[in-house]
Amino acid sequence: MKEYILNSKDAIRKQNTNSITKGWLLKWKLNDTWLKAPGFLYNYMYESYTEIIASVVAHSLGIDRCIQYKPCILVIDGIRVLGCESKDYKGDNKEITFSKLANIGEINDYRHSGYTGYKELIKEFKQKYSINLQSYLEDVILLDSIILNTDRNMWNLSVLVNKRNKVIECPIYDNGTSLGLDGLHSGMFEEKYMYDNGFRAEPFDIYFENQAKYIRNDILYLVDTPEIERAISYFEVNFCKNNKYNVVNTLQKGQIQFVKTLIASRLNTIVRNRLCIIT
């Protein structure tokens, strides 16, 4: 695993200054690689784990348009943490969020608009920008429904604009508030934190199962469950049972079990809805 020596003063900070963003990440950019430290420095220490596991789940589903986050060790001002790294997806392109487009009057605001709004959003992008986002949004909705991403919103759904002013797809990113880990602090694993008791979806409907029904019936996902199991086992061995890398943001046994149970339960729910096949 790669290790980086960093100074917090050199970080590009994204602070939780309003209700739009729940995350608090310290970020550094080295050439075409982004390094991200979890928000544990302030309030949420598990964001690296959720980003990495979420990207593994996406890969296991064959969702290639999701950013792949890999584990790395970040030594920040002498403090060792598990962080994550990813490749820069923008390059020379300009990123514009759906919320930004709505705020400047380019598109309508489709938050909490249900299936009708979902279809209208796809139609509007087709008419105005000659891009079909249906498959992209289906991947987002499926991934979010499995990892229980409670922070998907119009601020982390984006498109890219290239040098020729053509609108193209933006990869799926920002899955850090997922897997229930943002609600699990100080060893609290009570039933109230379980996946079916209090989690709310975004951005079209408050229920993940309702959004999952937006996916076309003829779309089939094959799930590589061993890939997910290997990733969770890696964290269990090296960051729970043992602190192999001597980091401060380790996981507890209850959290590992919680994530295992949650993903298995969510996959079974999706299978019952005949949206994918587990292998």
Named regions from a protein language model:
Residues 117-184:
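Conserved kinase catalytic-core segment
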Residues 1-105:
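Conserved ATP-binding subdomain of kinase catalytic cores across diverse folds
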